[in-house]
């Protein structure tokens, strides 16, 4: 849709985001997990979603690989396509936040500018940047998908951490040590959500 199309008008809904939050019993936010491939983003996000589900919190997990099977199946891994991938996911996450959900997203999202773009779209207070900080050597040793091996062999181009840059967050809301146990990292995130009055259970 062209930004200048005057025939497309925003339609307000009778049920507000605040009313949806009241219905759910918690605030709507997005936890944006970022880090290298193999850092543990999806694993920690999945562990947190499971813990929140047990507490009765309404959640949804958007995973980097999964969205490329549908929403972003037409995109490659050029800088332009990666930016569009993050833009689309940011828009979906924002809609889910307005629905009152706690949204967890697990994406490498290597560039600060793109993460900032989503932060501005969702709004301060509703965007929690989660940096899963795991050394490259550990990520390579894990290599659950064999991608680092392919990148080192020259079979995979533009791979983050090898021949494509990863810009680490400078002021993430929470900085996780990706070498710790997943249960410890999940507990740190639960503590953060409670401290910020996002969940009460």
UniProtKB/Swiss-Prot annotation:
InterPro entries documented for this protein: APS_kinase (IPR002891), P-loop_NTPase (IPR027417)
Signal peptide boundaries: none
Reaction(s) catalysed (UniProt annotation): adenosine 5'-phosphosulfate + ATP = 3'-phosphoadenylyl sulfate + ADP + H(+)
A single BP term in Gene Ontology: hydrogen sulfide biosynthetic process
Domain of life assignment: Bacteria
UniProt binding sites for ATP: 35-42
Keyword Cell inner membrane attributed: no
Pfam family, one: APS_kinase
Pathway: Sulfur metabolism; hydrogen sulfide biosynthesis; sulfite from sulfate: step 2/3
GO molecular function, one term: ATP binding
Assigned keywords, A-Z: ATP-binding, Kinase, Nucleotide-binding, Phosphoprotein, Transferase
Region described as Disordered: 1-23
Listed EC numbers: 2.7.1.25
Active site: 109 (phosphoserine intermediate)
Broad class of enzyme this protein falls into: transferase
Keyword Ion transport among UniProt keywords: no
Record's function text: Catalyzes the synthesis of activated sulfate.
HAMAP family on file: Adenylyl_sulf_kinase
Family of the protein in this entry: Belongs to the APS kinase family.
Protein name: Adenylyl-sulfate kinase
Organism: Escherichia coli O6:K15:H31 (strain 536 / UPEC)
Gene: cysC
